[in-house]
Amino acid sequence: MQHRIAERFRRGRLFLAGEAAHAYSPATGQGMNAAIQDAANLGWKLAFAAAQPGGSAILLASYDHERRPVARQVLAMTHLAFWGEASTGRLPALMRGTLAPLAAPLLPALMSRRHLVAAGIRLLSQLPVSYRGSPLSVEGTPQARGGPRAGDRLPDKIVRSAGRTIRLHELLARPGVHVLLERDADWPDDLAAGPMINVHRLTSAPAAA
């Protein structure tokens, strides 16, 4: 069993994604998730750069900055999981042969805790992935307290915009860059011009998902 990761995910006009960029052990089944996230991250940036050639250098460079650290984290997690499941070493053998049977009676109680199950699902689905260290992730001033920060995955909430009630992820499904404005936020009309720039004014605070 082997795992590997490319030294870089981009060189000039060449980009690596999916198993061309990284290969993991099958433990926890992360390969497809990572490949889809690579494609989603890179796809819109290529489309935007094609529509707006000027100033796209930082945008395209951000792909390697964002996805390669995530690939390293996933590699470490899958390696640890495979080590625990299959290694013939003394410690993993002790964990499987002695500690796991002792802990097995606790499993039903743990599985009944919805927050624990939800946290496990989020982890395996790679939903907590964050790009806070990306050159594209710039915090506002003053920095907002609580909630997602620049580079975090945006939660899916129910909002009102342009007279309709809609889920936030559905509102943002259109390709391009999206600007979310509060009801009374100032926004010059001329800044809304340009291809792949979408401006949404939220007329109510996000409700619980």
Feature-to-residue mapping (PLM):
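FAD/FMN-dependent oxidoreductases across multiple families
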Residues: 1-30, 34, 55-57, 70, ...
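Functional cores that coordinate and move charged inorganic groups
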Residues: 32-46, 50
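Helical substrate-recognition/capping region of FAD-dependent monooxygenase/halogenase enzymes
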Residues: 48-209
